[in-house]
Amino acid sequence: MKTIKIGIAGGRGLSTVMGLKAIEGVEITAACDLNEDALKVIAKETGATKTYRVFDDMLESDIDAVIIATPMQCHVPQAIAALEAGKHVMSEVTAGVTMDELFWLCESVEKYNKTYMLAENYAYMPNVQLVKEMVKQGLFGEPYYAEGSYLHNCTDLLKYPDGKTSWRSYWQMGRRGSFYPTHSLGPVMGFFPGDRVTEISCFSPGTYNEFGVKQDSGTTTMCRTEKGKLINIRVDCTSPRPHNMSHYHLQGTKGVFETGSGKGDGDKIALLGEGNPIGCMHWEDISNYLEYLPERYKKATDEQNNAGHGGGDFFIVEDFINAIRTGEAPEIDVYKACEWTAVGLLSGISVANNGKTMQIPNFRKNMPLEEKIIKLD
C-alpha cells in the first residue's frame, strides 16, 4: 500500500493529527504557517520534517494531500492552488467566504479531478451517526423536520494574544446572518439522504453586544429542502452563555430524537410502538439504541476514540484517505460543502432584508447555468 504524504497548513489542522496518525499508510511530512512560533508547534505535534512559511512552497514538495486549516478567507484560494498542483484537499469549515468563491471551487474540483472534502467533523460524532443509521433503517418513519444549533461565545477570539485584531473579527463576527452554519446544518442533513436545501429565510433579534461587531446576537434560519422538508438552524457566537457545542433535533412520522440541551440532560429518543403509544410516549436514553451505532464506531480502538469527538475526528480523516485511495466521492464532497456554506452566506442578505427568502443555487455538475445563479423571489 502506497504511503500517502500529508501537508498541514495552519494551526487549526492539529485537530486532525491524532486521526491521521492512527491510519496505516499515512505520514505527515510537511507543515506550513506564517507564524514561525505556530509553525514550530505544528511541526512538533505532527512530526513533520519539512516546514514552510509560504503555502505555494509546500505545494512544490512531494505531498499527496493537504489539510487546509488556515483562516476562512484563505480556504478557497489555497484549495484551488493545491488542486492545480495535483494535491488532494481536506478543508476546514467553512468552504469559502463569498458566493463567487464557491462556484470557482466546484469548477476547480471538476477540472483537476482530485479529492476534495469538507472537514465538518460534527457530522461524524457518534450520536449523529447512530441516528443517521436509524433513519436509514426506517425507525423514525419519514423524517420531515430537524433543528441544529451551534451556541458558542467566540468574542474572546476577536483579538490575538498580542492585542491585534484577529481575522475572526472580520470574516466571522464582522458579518451578519448564520455566518458559520455547517456545525448546525451538516449533521442534520445526514438525516435527509439525497436531499439538499433549496431556499432559506433568516431572522435575528438584532445586535446586543458591547464589542462593536456586526454579527447578530443569534440568528434563526429556516431552510426548506428540495423534497419539502424543513430545517431550523440557530447560530449564536456573541451572547454570554456556556458553550453548548451542538444541539440537534429530528422529527419523523414514527419518532423523535433530541440531544441534551443543558447540564444533566442527555441524548434521547422516543419511537412509536406497543410500549410507547400515541398520547403516552416517553423518552429513552440513546444508550438503549447503541446497536445501531455503525460497526466501525463499535470497534474503534482507544487511539481512534482519543482523536476527538468520540472518534469522529478519526473517522472523518479515514474517509478522506479512503476517498483518495479508491477515487470515490467522499461523504462531504465539494457540492455539499458549497451548499451548506451558501446557506450561511445568503442568510446575511436575507436577515438584512427582513427575512427575505433566498434561493440556494444548485452547485451540482452539469447543471444548466440558470440553476447556478442567485435568484431573488
What are these regions (language model features)?
Residues 1-46:
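N-terminal Rossmann-like dinucleotide-binding module
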Residues 12, 122-213, 221-223:
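Predominantly a Rossmann-like dinucleotide-binding segment in NAD(P)-dependent oxidoreductases
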Residues 48-55:
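Conserved SAM-binding strand-loop segment of SAM-dependent methyltransferases
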Residues 63-65, 71-72, 76-124, 138:
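Beta-strand-loop-alpha-helix segment that lines the small-molecule cofactor/substrate pocket
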Residues 86, 113, 138, 228, ...:
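Glycine-centered short loops/turns at secondary-structure junctions
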Residues 157, 179-277, 284, 305-306, ...:
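Contiguous beta-strand/loop segments that form the cofactor/metal-binding neighborhood of enzyme cores
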